[in-house]
Regions:
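HAMP domain helices
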Residues: 1-141
Length: 141
């Protein structure tokens, strides 16, 4: 019927628009129009399930994920993904946290090493001074 064809055409149009939204990075988009054709209904359901899986395994906003990855590539680990729910989002935040911890540990270790090195240098200077004093005393006798 004409009404069924119009309903199907509307669903196809919305499906194409939804794919465009997903291509722009938004994985929360879903097809809501209801076609009449059973094959189009199945296609709509399959596409929506695919989007559900992508959102669960990756996250909601591909652009935000890409931005964080670019920051990480530039060795900037200060930012996190807000409202991380997808596996990639959660893992990205966890990796960022672990890298920050490792960098802090390395910094603490380097500071401790610098402090101990200063103490050692001072001890060597004292030992050298004492050795020179003893050598001078021995020369006097």
């Amino acid at each position: 019927t004409k009404q069924g064809l119009e309903q199907d055409a509307k669903a196809v149009k919305e499906s194409v628009e939804t794919v465009g939204v997903v291509e722009s990075g938004n994985l929360t988009a879903r097809i809501t129009a209801n076609p009449r054709n059973p094959q189009l209904i199945e296609l709509k359901n399959v596409l929506n399930r695919l989007l559900d899986v992508l959102q669960t395994k990756v996250g909601s906003d591909m652009n935000a994920i890409h931005k964080i990855f670019e920051e990480y590539k530039s060795l900037d680990f200060r930012n996190k993904l807000d409202n991380a729910n997808g596996s990639v989002e959660v893992t990205t935040n966890a990796l960022g946290d672990e890298i920050v911890k490792m960098l802090k540990q390395s910094s603490d270790f380097a500071n401790h090493l610098a402090s101990e090195s200063s103490k050692l240098q001072s001890a060597v200077q004292n030992l050298t001074s004492s050795s020179n004093s003893q050598a001078a005393s021995l020369e006097e006798t």
